[in-house]
Amino acid sequence: MTWQARIDAALRAREASHSLRRRVVCTPAPGGALVHQGVRYRNFSGNDYLGLSQHPALIAAWQQGAQTYGVGSGASGHVSGYSDAHQSLENALAHWLGFDRALLFISGFAANQAVVAALMQQSDRILADRLSHASLLEAASHSPATLRRFAHNDSGALAALLGKPCDGLTLVFTEGVFSMDGDSAPLADIAGIAQGAQTLLMVDDAHGVGVQGREGRGSCDVAGIRPDLLLVTFGKAFGLSGAALLCSAPMADYLLQTARHLIYSTAMPAAQACALNAALTVIREGDDLRARLARNIARFRAGAASLPLTLADSQTAIQPLIVGENSAALTLAEKLRERGCWVTAIRPPTVPAGTARLRLTLSAAHQDEDIDALLEALYDGCR
């Protein structure tokens, strides 16, 4: 077989199963919207939960940062790419979330990969929720450590795995809010189980931080816990991109020596760090935004209760509607777009076979009429 034959066969298989991914050119717009080919749509497919990607304070902070620092960092943070803007953001994040230190990464994917690669050795084990993010699972598959996945949100299953002997150390990994189902982990139970000098607890709170807890401190604040490692990402509630890992001072110093994704990547632009600092201020003062998002979630769930589809048990901004077959999910998504609602069908392998879904996401930027328009389009599309 040639390389071309292998690639062609893989693409044909994806096409036949209605699982071929294609990108679509979109332009973000204010008010929880986007523009595609000159047409404005209500956007229910993004992760801009508080609408901050269009916030004037963030835009102004980025512009001012670019005037001060330029548009790129020009180097790894280990060389000359670490500015006072980066340091200020790290310090503010650590203070806000109650940790010694914060380390900035170019993405949450890179941060998860870096932690696993830097920490895990052959005698160690990773105990991860079965629905953990692909970044963690991919890193674990390349790690010399043993990966064991426990049943989703099943703290008893985790306890059983922890009860088994291990020659080395253990990393327990879960998420605050799961990206495809929108449900929350039983963090208090998991933290109570994952204790001891030989166990680290890491929580990826990409979809919880900013929208849950006091001042938006996230899922761990709601649960009243502080994990050993906390990942927050900036592509959701913060409205930008990048990520930060919160940890102890010794852990931060260790990762600065060993985390290759951090050492060998160009640092995020200082202007971006300025915008992220502005986003943090808006988030900490954003109770009104979080209340608006909560009202939108409640309005949607009340209206969607009678739909002839399975509505996932989620109280978060992620509201999945389980359709089943790939083709049916694609057809329904297209019907919604015809009604001016931009919705994306999520298909295997991102979700299990037979559970293709519309992953609806709500934002504080949406108004009542946006939610009502989505509900009307869903009822019409299901006829």
Swiss-Prot record:
Known pathway: Cofactor biosynthesis; biotin biosynthesis
Superkingdom to which the source organism belongs: Bacteria
Binding site for pyridoxal 5'-phosphate: G108, F109, S179, H207, T233
Positions where N6-(pyridoxal phosphate)lysine occurs in the chain: K236
Cofactor(s) recorded in Swiss-Prot or TrEMBL: pyridoxal 5'-phosphate
GO molecular function terms listed in the Swiss-Prot or TrEMBL record: 8-amino-7-oxononanoate synthase activity; pyridoxal phosphate binding
Gene Ontology BP annotations: biotin biosynthetic process
Record-given protein name: 8-amino-7-oxononanoate synthase
Organism expressing this protein natively: Cronobacter sakazakii (strain ATCC BAA-894) (Enterobacter sakazakii)
